[in-house]
Amino acid sequence: MFKNLKIIKLENRALLKIKGEDSKEFLQALVTNNINFISNEKSIYSALLSPQGKYLYDFFIFQDSKSNYLIIDCEKNSYQELIQKLNIYKLRSNVEINLLDRIDVYTVYGSDLIKFISNLKMTYQEGYTKNISDNLFFIDPRNKSLGLRVYSNNLSNEFKEIASGILSDWHYLRIKNNIPHPYIDLEKEKSFIIENNFEKINAIDFNKGCYIGQENTARQKYRGTAKRKLVTAEIIGKDVTNGEKIVFDNRAVGTIRSSSKDICLVSIRSEVYDKCKRDNIKIKINESELKFL
């Protein structure tokens, strides 16, 4: 029925259960997005920063529809660090943080996605959330083009009939839409999220009030102090490698981030990007050229 639809089981995810009467207030004071946006019909994407406003962790946050406790969907290889960091800030708050197991995470994407979403009687908008037969679904809050996230310990037959996808194809879709994968495209304790499209992917609420790193993040937005942009470029020639330096006018101006097939993400100085776009300039890197899209 849905030939142009793929499903991938995301093996690199971990789920944390946040419960206790202070859990919402606790997270609201820490993370970049607004916890009060979360409901049984709305999930969010957010980040935890250092006091200097630099990237530490990113995650999805949603609500268990039965008990109303919060669930954080984060990278599996850093969940223990994240728990430790959250516990440091917990102090006397009535909050419990535990690993939630026996639930698998999937992403569903493809050109038939809108029809499939309609079949589930869901609204095709970022963060829209629905619980169906004890399975939780939400449209990716970063960009609806990234697909449907599914949380289940027993997929229904309609999902089992979807063909398996390839993670590299999903990354191509991500890069095409200029969306960072933080553990590839950002450097922990070094990168600023304003310079890496976190506002564009709905991870920051500038009206919520204070959170860790808020002052520097707000300054970069309102005073225009951000120096770099994360942009998508076409690769003309041979493949490029994550971490390769970009030189323009005899000075280092940027770095290659994630790539897939003939496109990549590039962290580059804003004035260089603006000049290249304005004057239709390609940047040479080894045996290739980059054309900003």
Predicted regions and their residues:
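Short amphipathic beta-strand starts and helix->beta connectors
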Residues: 1-3, 44-58, 88-91, 129-137, ...
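Acidic, proline/glycine-enriched N-terminal capping motif
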Residues: 1-58, 64-67
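Short, surface-exposed ligand-recognition loops at beta-strand->loop->(often short) alpha-helix junctions
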Residues: 17-23, 108-112, 234-241
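Hydrophobic side chains in well-ordered alpha-helices
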Residues: 26-27, 82-85, 229
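Glycine-rich, small/acidic residue-mixed loop/short-helix segments
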Residues: 55, 196-202, 214, 218-293
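Acidic, low-complexity central loop/insert segments
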Residues: 6-8, 14-17, 60-177, 248, ...
